[in-house]
Every structure is written in structure tokens, then in C-alpha cells.
From Swiss-Prot:
Gene3D superfamilies: THAP domain (6.20.210.20). InterPro entries: THAP9-like_HTH, THAP9_C, THAP_Znf, THAP_Znf_sf, TNP-like_GBD, TNP-like_RNaseH_C, TNP-like_RNaseH_N. SMART domains: DM3 (SM00692), THAP (SM00980). This is DNA transposase THAP9. Keywords: DNA integration, DNA recombination, DNA-binding, Metal-binding, Transferase, Zinc, Zinc-finger. It comes from Homo sapiens (Human). The lineage of its organism: Eukaryota, Metazoa, Chordata, Craniata, Vertebrata.
Length: 903
């Protein structure tokens, strides 16, 4: 039932039309003192008891009776301040008596006496004596009559439109007007062919049946233009009502009302970390299959927009799910908002879902600053449907807020996806011309071909590398193609005057530019340096210089035939970065630069898809399948994941590092992909019988008193195996570098590693050897304890904890990784801890399979190293890391890809 304002003389009703006009409605407070103040301000008496009027549970007051200073704003949403009391005169804004027909004419003809009492309506009781001017009441009546006449005129016009199509159903009428696409027409005819729309009362939304709600939401999501057309005929509800209908508490498609309720409580409690967010949207493929769900006693696999399955025989099955996630601009919160089962995640459908989501977040007081999507064909269609212009000549990076005409929202394409598009274009063109030179793909091929190149065989060796003749070049295959490391390596090879790299100046400049762009849109913490730091007024000029340079170069890019790339078929990667640059400038000018805004800085990774990819990665772990899941499997996995990681008064949290997700997403953009595509062979390490001499002065006295030739050699074998195995699995460039010897400053230039090699053995780093030595010492210490009577898994977890405890006292391990710790988010679980854990797990697995046959202990006979090597290598090939889930809370994190978080 529609409620009316309880103030005397006010006929404002709580309808969609009233809320569209900016009015809000407020219930009487529950606090006794505050409630009594409101009652006295209303100034009403009960007509029967002649006593003061007591409001019921449904009594409300409209915002007309409050001062503007009584409200406080949360984004677009307004809320009454605590202690606010209605003070605006009830008759300051004239309101007429709600009468019709002859009664209306009579009251206009008869003048009111000067001391008349107010006439009560059906919705109001008698009040205390209050003066009311005759002119004000007549004016209100005339205004109301004009509004009613205007509404009747529009209604008559709309119904005449239907009468012109006498004999046609609604869908036929829409087809005749050419408002429906073929896909939408087929969907509506299949699901609503027998829908008797003319028999329903469409004016009262409270009386809508489930089928009416489903029809309205389906029509809106398919086309807002069609919805607006039909709304004139059937009086369909405003989109704000649809947002409410699509909210669900149970684990089914639609918006998660529990999440929105939690966010609303945080906003209303004044938590500023929840006032601004970015919105991420992504589609995930599903397997088209119908399955019987015993729990719901229904078939699963149909399309579902949140109001029930579209289960007609001719309706296509769901093939994709669209997910939406909010990421806090401040703080470290991120939470999935809901999902929808669709047959095809078209750009227009995703645009409609975005509008509903933005409006729903606005209703609870959260302001959406930006939207991020993939750089796909459907995403481009979605951007255009929102009002984004991607063309270089007329670029528009913002679109209008669906609930506020005065607010704009920025649009971003995911930077990682843009890198992949640029990589494909670079490899396809082979050569890209621009004003600073020519970038050649062949230079990257020549770089990876230097793998295992001995420095002693090189014609020219710089004086700085004169003592590295027994070293070999090892290309760090985890290095990103577009990185400063590759650019520095090419720059160094250019200085050596090597023939394959004599014309690589243009390639170096191109790689550095793309790397700088990615760093700008991937700033992760406020302690970052250079372009990886936050967006501040102090750093804006430097960042803006790179953005201007990128625009200047991108508009001049051309292939070998002088065809402009930015106007060709493979332009989206370059145009996407230009659009992101405009969006970043707009955000800085509107939120960071103005002193009145609460934005001290801006971290651009808040607009990255890494957050959503993290959720999907964890979702796939719950699914335990590499193929596309069915609708029922996805729904159950989503519910299990949400239940596991969403605690009371907590937003969705994760123990997996976002930084690792970012590296994993760019795995196919590393140098190893070039090695694989062009057949560059990588020499495997072969161990021989000859002894390896290395300084082990840091060993314990008990070990020093022994003949350590075999012991030393075996430990180095283990360290070498661990280094080679992890270098093939890790995707972090800095962590791989830390595995190899780096006793000289010139041991690393960009992506090139100068690794000491003797008798086929790559020397591991000193820190790695120390870790392996500590691992062996701890295992020996506990080898005769009762712990070895435990099952294998429990024994491994026990040893892992003991080794980590022993390593915690060694602060000088892998010191070269210290700067690398600030590349990701500030957190306790960083790459240093993860690297230690990976080394420990790898060592224990190798040792567990070979200790019975080749124990690491001193004996008089020399071990057959070839046999040891062969057995160790076989065990490494079969090696899979175990879970580390039960480790102490300080080092516990979720592993993936056979136990390796960086894979």
C-alpha cells in the first residue's frame, strides 16, 4: 500500500514519481525523546479522543518539512542527521485538498472563512487550528488539476498507440515498430508468447506477480529503448524498483543483498573507506548443460537474470555468467556483488547490468569512480553503449551516472589485456615504425637465443666482465617482454656491437614506453617509487609527461607498408591505453587535485582486473576442474567460496597475493613464450663426478671436522636441482635471479644473468646453499625422533614449520630481493617468505624420495654422482609440491598450480 506524508495539509505520497522528483520519506524515530519532538512539530490531534495524535508504525514525513541543513550526503544518497526535527512550515509550500469532480469545483467556488479549520483528508486526522489563506489553497488545487489533466492526456495518447495495432500482441507491435533485434524477439516470443499483458494492473508495483517482474526485467536488460517505449503504455516501474527485485539473499543469480546490506551499514556508520569504489565486470564461459538439482527440485542450466529461470523450450541455455565486483578506492576491501546467467554476454546487456549495479551502490551511499572491463569486442560494444568514444580523434573517457545527471564515471580497459593485444600486434607486424625509430620483433628472438652462451666464446668482452670468462649467459625466461629488464639487456648487447643487436635503439625505446605505461596503471602501494608510485600532485607532472609521449608516438605508429596502425585492425591495444590515460587525467583533476576532496593519492591498481581474476582463480580451485563449469557447479562453488571467506561483519577477503595474480596473468607475455615459439633450445644441467669447490666457512664446527667432499657436493647438487626446478616454475623475475650466484655486481644486466658454470653445473646462489644446508641440518636433527612415525603428510608439515622457525633467525638471506618486496601490496606474506617455502617444499620432496637409497651422510666410498644425478633428476620430474595450508598463521598462504603461487 502506498503511504502518504503524515503532515497536515501535505498530500505527498511515497511513489516512484515522488522519488524521481528528489523527495525522500522518513519514518518517525524510535528514540522516545526524538519521537516526541517530531510529534509536537507535526501538531496533530486525534479526532476521536481529541488528544494529541500518536503516529503508527507506518507513519512517515516527506523531505519538504526539513531544512536543507538537516541532511547529510553519502555520495548521491541523502540521510537525515541525528537529532533533526521537522521545522519547515507545513503551509510554506501550498498543498491543496485532494478532491475530485464536483467536490473540486465546489471548493474552488466557495471562499473559506478567515478563521476556518483545515479540512481533513482520508489519509489525515484533524489538527490544531492553523491559518490557511484562500489564495494558497485555490492555487494548489488549480496546479493539481493541471497535472492530472496532463497525465490523462499522455495516457490517452499511449493507449491510442495500442488501438492503432488492434489485433496485435505487444511483441508484434514492438516488431512492427522495428524496436527489437532478432535475438531479443526470439527470447521474448519463446518465454512470453502466452503472456496476457493487457489483463494485469501495471500501475501498482506491489501487486506485480513473478511473471510480471520477470517480463519487466528481461525487457529492461535486453533494451532500455524498448523498455522506455513499453513503459509509456504499461506504466512499467522505474529502474530503481528493478534493482530491488534483482536482489537475492539465497545463493542464486542476481545481486547479493547480504553484501549490499553490509556495505550500507559501513557507510551509515561513517566509515570513509567504503564511500568510494571502482566497479569490475567480466564474463566467464559456462558449459551448456541441463542438470537436475535435488536440493531445489528443478532443472539447472537456463538463463537467469535474477528473477527466475527463462525455461521455455525455445529459450537458449546459459553459456556465460557475468560477474560484478566492487573494489574499495581506500583500504583493502573487495567483494563480489553478484552474477547473472546469460546466453551471450553482449555489450548492451553488460551495459544495462552496470547501470543497475551503479544505481544500487548509489542507493546505499557508495560512489563509483570508474568501471573496468576486458578489452574484447563485447567490452568495446559495452563502452559505446554507455557513451564512451574510443576513436582517437574524438575520445570521451567518461559516461553519465545513471542516477545523477551531474556526475560522471571514468572507464578503463584492463591493462594486462591491453599488453596482450600490443604483444600480438608487435609479433604480427614484426616491425613497427614511429617517430623515434623502428621496433623489431627479431631482437627479442635473438635475445632468447643467447641462452647458455659462454662468455669465453664471445669476440668482445668488456673490461667489467674480464673475470667472468668461466660464466655463461642465462636469459631469465620469466622476464616480461615489455620491461625495463629486456630494454636494459638489449642496451647492453648494443654496446657490445654484436651484429644481431646493432639496430635495436627503436626496439629499446618502444619496450620502455610500453613498460612505463603499464607501471603507471599498476601502482600498488603508497611506498612505490617512480612511475610505480601513487598518483600525487607531486608525481603528476612526471606521469603526465609519459602519457603525452605515448599519445604522440601511438598516433604515428605504422607498419612496413606505412599503414597507420591506430586506424587499422589491431589498434585496440594502443587506443585502450590512450583511453586509460584520459580517464586517469580526469580522475586526478576531479578527485586528487581539488583540495576539498578526501583523496590524498590514488593507486591505479584499484582499476585492475587482478582483483576479479583472484576471485575466479579461487573459484576454479573450489570447482576442481580445468574445463568450463555448468551452471549448477558454478552456483554451488560460488556459494561455498562466499561462505568460506565472507565472515560476519567482514567483506570478502583472500590470502592469495594480488601481486602474484598479476604476474600469473602475464605469464604468456614473458620471454619463455618466445623461446617456445621459435624453438630455442635450453640446455639442461648435467652433473658430473668432478668435485665442486666453494667456500663453506659458514658451516658448523662438527661438519668442518669431517671430510666434506661428498657432503659438500651433495648439498650443491640439491641446491642446483632446486634452482633449476624452481626457475622453470616461478614466474617472478626477481625471485629466479635470487636462486643463482650473484657475488659480483656485474652478474645481472637486465634480463641477462651471468651464472658461473663448471663441469655442467650452474652454481646456485650462496643464500640458496645456506637454506639447503639448514634444511638438511633440521631434517637430520629430527630424523630419529618420534615424528618420523607419523604419516608422510603430517611429517612434512612438521618439518616445514621447524625449518621456517630455524630460518627466521637468518636476516641476510636473499638480500637482493629486499627492494622487490615493495612491488606488491604491503602485507606480511611477501615473495621472500614464499620463496623460502617453495625451496623447503622442493627440498623435502626430493629428499623424501631418495633418502632411503642415497642418504646424505659421510661415507668412505665416493658416491656415484652420475647415478645420483639420474635418480635425483627422475625424482624432480615427478615432483609435485604439497599443500602448505596448515602452516603457522604467520607464513600460511594459499598455494596454486601444484603448490607454486607464482606459476
Amino acid at each position: 500500500m502506498t503511504r502518504s506524508c503524515s503532515a497536515v495539509g501535505c498530500s505527498t505520497r511515497d511513489t516512484v514519481l515522488s522519488r524521481e522528483r528528489g523527495l525522500s520519506f522518513h519514518q518517525f524515530p524510535t528514540d522516545t525523546i526524538q519521537r516526541s519532538k517530531w510529534i509536537r512539530a507535526v501538531n496533530r490531534v486525534d479526532p476521536r479522543s481529541k488528544k494529541i495524535w500518536i503516529p503508527g508504525p507506518g507513519a512517515i514525513l516527506c523531505s519538504k518539512h526539513f531544512q536543507e541543513s538537516d541532511f547529510e550526503s553519502y555520495g548521491i544518497r541523502r540521510k537525515l542527521k541525528k537529532g533533526a526535527v521537522p521545522s519547515v512550515s507545513l503551509y510554506k509550500i501550498p498543498q491543496g485538498v485532494h478532491l475530485k469532480g464536483k467536490a473540486r469545483q465546489k471548493i474552488l467556488k466557495q471562499p473559506l472563512p478567515d478563521n476556518s479549520q483545515e479540512v481533513a483528508t482520508e489519509d489525515h486526522n484533524y489538527s490544531l487550528k492553523t491559518p490557511l489563506t484562500i489564495g494558497a489553497e485555490k492555487l494548489a488545487e488549480v496546479q493539481q488539476m493541471l497535472q492530472v489533466s496532463k497525465k490523462r492526456l499522455i495516457s490517452v495518447k499511449n493507449y491510442r498507440m495500442i488501438k492503432k495495432r488492434k489485433g496485435l500482441r505487444l511483441i508484434d507491435a514492438l516488431v512492427e515498430e522495428k524496436l527489437l533485434s532478432e535475438e531479443t524477439e526470439c527470447l521474448l516470443r519463446a518465454q512470453f508468447s502466452d503472456f496476457k499483458w493487457e489483463l494485469y494492473n501495471w500501475r501498482e508495483t506491489d501487486e506485480y506477480s513473478a511473471e510480471m517482474k520477470q517480463f519487466a526485467c528481461t525487457l529492461y536488460l535486453c533494451s532500455s529503448k524498448v523498455y522506455d517505449y513499453v513503459r509509456k503504455i504499461l506504466k512499467l516501474p522505474h529502474s530503481s524498483i528493478l534493482r530491488t527485485w534483482l536482489s537475492k539473499c539465497q545463493p542464486s543469480p542476481g545481486f547479493n543483498s547480504n553484501i549490499f546490506s553490509f556495505l550500507q551499514r559501513r557507510v551509515e556508520n561513517g566509515d570513509q573507506l567504503y564511500q568510494y569504489c571502482s566497479l569490475l565486470i567480466k564474463s566467464m564461459p559456462l558449459k551448456q548443460q541441463l542438470q537436475w538439482d535435488p536440493s531445489s527440485h528443478s532443472l539447472q542450466g537456463f538463463m537467469d537474470f535474477g528473477l527466475g529461470k527463462l525455461d521455455a523450450d525455445e529459450t537458449p541455455l546459459a553459456s556465460e555468467t557475468v560477474l560484478l565486483m566492487a573494489v574499495g578506492i581506500f583500504g583493502h576491501w573487495r567483494t563480489p556483488l553478484g552474477y547473472f546467467f546469460v546466453n551471450r554476454a553482449s555489450g548492451y546487456l553488460q551495459a544495462q547490468l552496470l547501470r543497475l549495479t551503479i544505481g544500487k551502490l548509489s542507493d546505499i551511499g557508495i560512489t563509483v569512480l570508474a568501471v573496468t572491463s576486458d578489452a574484447t569486442a563485447h567490452s568495446v560494444q559495452m563502452a559505446k553503449a554507455l557513451g564512451i568514444h574510443i576513436d582517437g580523434d574524438d575520445m570521451k573517457c567518461t559516461f553519465q551516472h545513471p542516477s545523477s545527471s551531474s556526475q560522471q564515471i571514468a572507464y578503463f580497459f584492463d591493462s594486462c589485456h591491453l599488453l596482450r593485444l600490443i604483444r600480438n600486434a608487435f609479433q604480427n607486424f614484426q616491425s613497427i615504425q614511429f617517430i623515434n625509430g623502428i621496433a623489431h620483433w627479431q631482437h627479442l628472438v635473438e635475445l632468447v637465443a643467447l641462452e647458455e652462451q659462454e662468455l669465453s666464446n664471445m669476440e668482445r668482452i668488456p673490461s667489467t666482465l674480464a673475470n667472468l670468462k668461466n660464466h655463461v649467459l642465462k636469459v631469465n625466461s620469466a622476464t616480461q617482454l615489455f620491461s625495463e629488464s629486456v630494454a636494459s639487456a638489449l642496451e647492453y648487447l648494443l654496446s657490445l656491437d654484436l651484429p644481431p643487436f646493432q639496430n635495436c635503439i627503436g626496439t629499446i625505446h618502444f619496450l620502455r614506453l610500453i613498460n612505463n605505461l603499464f607501471d603507471i596503471f599498476n601502482s600498488r602501494n603508497c611506498y612505490g617509487k617512480g612511475l610505480k608510485g601513487p598518483l600525487l600532485p607531486e608525481t603528476y607532472s612526471k606521469i603526465n609527461h609519459v602519457l603525452i609521449e605515448a599519445k604522440t608516438i601511438f598516433v604515428t605508429l605504422s607498419d612496413t607498408s606505412n599503414n597507420q596502425i591506430i586506424k587499422g585492425k589491431q589498434k585496440l591495444g594502443f587506443l585502450g591505453f590512450l583511453l586509460n590515460a584520459e580517464s586517469l587525467k580526469w580522475l586526478y583533476q576531479n578527485y586528487v587535485f581539488p583540495k576539498v576532496m578526501p583523496f590524498p593519492y590514488l593507486l591505479t591498481y584499484k582499476f585492475s582486473h587482478d582483483h576479479l581474476e583472484l576471485f575466479l582463480k579461487m573459484l576454479r580451485q573450489v570447482l576442481v576442474t580445468s574445463s568450463s563449469p555448468t551452471c549448477m557447479a558454478f552456483q554451488k562453488a560460488y556459494y561455498n567460496l562466499e561462505t568460506r571467506y565472507k565472515f560476519q561483519d567482514e567483506v570478502f577477503l583472500s590470502k592469495v597475493s594480488i601481486f602474484d595474480i598479476s604476474i600469473a596473468r602475464r605469464k604468456d607475455l614473458a620471454l619463455w613464450t618466445v623461446q617456445r615459439q621459435y624453438g630455442v633450445s635450453v640446455t639442461k644441467t648435467v652433473f658430473h663426478e668432478e668435485g665442486i669447490c666453494q667456500d663453506w666457512s659458514h658451516c658448523s664446527l662438527s661438519e668442518a671436522l669431517l671430510d666434506l667432499s661428498d657432503h659438500r657436493r651433495n648439498l650443491i647438487c640439491y641446491a642446483g636441482y632446486v634452482a633449476n626446478k624452481l626457475s622453470a616454475l616461478l614466474t617472478c623475475e626477481d625471485c629466479i635471479t635470487a636462486l643463482y650466484a650473484s657475488d659480483l655486481k656485474a652478474s645481472k644486466i637486465g634480463s641477462l644473468l651471468f651464472v658461473k658454470k663448471k663441469n655442467g653445473l650452474h652454481f646456485p646462489s650462496e643464500s640458496l646453499c645456506r637454506v639447503i644446508n639448514i634444511c638438511e641440518r633440521v631434517v637430520r636433527t629430527h630424523s630419529r625422533m618420534a615424528i618420523f612415525e607419523l604419516v608422510s603428510k603430517q611429517r612434512e608439515l612438521y618439518l616445514q614449520q621447524k625449518i621456517l622457525c630455524e630460518l627466521s633467525g637468518h636476516i641476510n638471506l636473499f638480500v637482493d630481493v629486499n627492494k622487490h618486496l615493495f612491488d606488491g601490496e604491503v602485507c606480511a606474506i611477501n615473495h621472500f617468505v614464499k620463496l623460502l617455502k617453495d625451496i623447503i617444499i622442493c627440498f623435502l620432496n626430493i629428499r623424501a624420495k631418495n633418502v632411503a637409497q642415497n642418504p646424505l651422510k659421510h661415507h668412505s666410498e665416493r658416491t656415484d654422482m652420475k647415478t645420483l644425478s639420474r635418480k635425483h633428476w627422475s625424482s624432480v620430474q615427478d615432483y609435485k609440491c604439497s599443500s602448505f595450508a596448515n602452516t603457522s598463521s604467520k607464513f600460511r598462504h594459499l598455494l596454486s598450480n601444484d603448490g607454486y603461487p607464482f606459476k
